[in-house]
């Protein structure tokens, strides 16, 4: 239910199941939509004037407690106000891509520490400004078991990389960075012509190209078909494949 309470504080105790809580502070013009994974036994407290909705991941049982009077004929007057925070399309995108476990060690001990609101896919250019587009939460979680940082959502590769427009080599500063990195790695790791360097998510081969110039064998793995084609054309052997 997309709604907010102008006066009352809402408390939700999840007895069983799990859901994704989405909130937005309506009194702060700079606030963004934030998500939070709620698991059984946890209590969510929603202050007044915070828009709120839930996306359930499984059948769940919860106790919904709101301070103050609550008459059924009072809905939308002073007690509970409608506010469309999440539409059907956004809800489906989140259900499809939200990660409840660490993608490295499968731990459920994920702690969010960066929340930047909803964002369209990178370089997802529209033909017309009126065209609709997909949005996803842009948030970073920290796994307290393996210490890996990762996005809270994993957009399906086909949707993300069907026609990827970003090319790393368009930036001279980025090129220089990887040239210096290649030199440093060659010295510190004693890389030779017998070595093999594999770059997963290699884009157009910006990191591997200076290694090849040193005579070091290199292989790129790139999920975007159009970008992998460019890398191969530029002499950087690249396999078009998604690694997840």
Predicted regions and their residues:
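Double-stranded beta-helix
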Residues: 57-94
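Conserved SAM-binding strand-loop segment of SAM-dependent methyltransferases
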Residues: 235-244
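Short beta-strand His + acidic residue motifs that chelate non-heme Fe in jelly-roll/DSBH
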Residues: 2, 21-22, 46, 52-57, ...
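Glycine- and acidic-residue-biased ligand/ion/polar-headgroup-sensing regions
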Residues: 7-26
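Conserved SAM-binding loop of SAM-dependent methyltransferases across substrates and taxa
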Residues: 204-215
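N-terminal juxtadomain amphipathic helix
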Residues: 95-173
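Short acidic-glycine-tyrosine-enriched beta hairpin
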Residues: 26-48
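Conserved class I S-adenosyl-L-methionine
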Residues: 193-203
